[in-house]
Amino acid sequence: MSEPIYKFFTGRFLPDWYQLSKEEQDSILAKLNDALAKLGAKRIILCNTYWSTDEWLWAGVEEFPNIEAVQKYMAALHELNWDRYTEATSLLGTKWEP
């Protein structure tokens, strides 16, 4: 049985994001949330970090049921041109119980 995969991420919007209308931005974000739900994944937390760093606007954690779900979600991000609108860094991990 596969174990959950946690994705820790930080990100910021690029200039192209701000060229979109509010409706276009909301549509993309809704599609991202739909993709998470369809894969059985969830966003555990999303934090504003703009007040604590010059580099990132947000940080968060998402939980995926398995690595295949992570890969499918990344494909969904690519289909939505997410990399055109954002710059981000992420790290995958599994639960550690020492």
Predicted regions and their residues:
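Short S/T/G/P-rich N-terminal loop/turn motif that feeds into the first structured element of a domain
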Residues: 1-57, 65-75, 93-98
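Short, surface-exposed basic-aromatic patches at helix termini and helix-loop junctions that form
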Residues: 75-82
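Conserved short beta-strand edge segments in small beta-sheet-based binding/regulatory domains
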Residues: 82-94
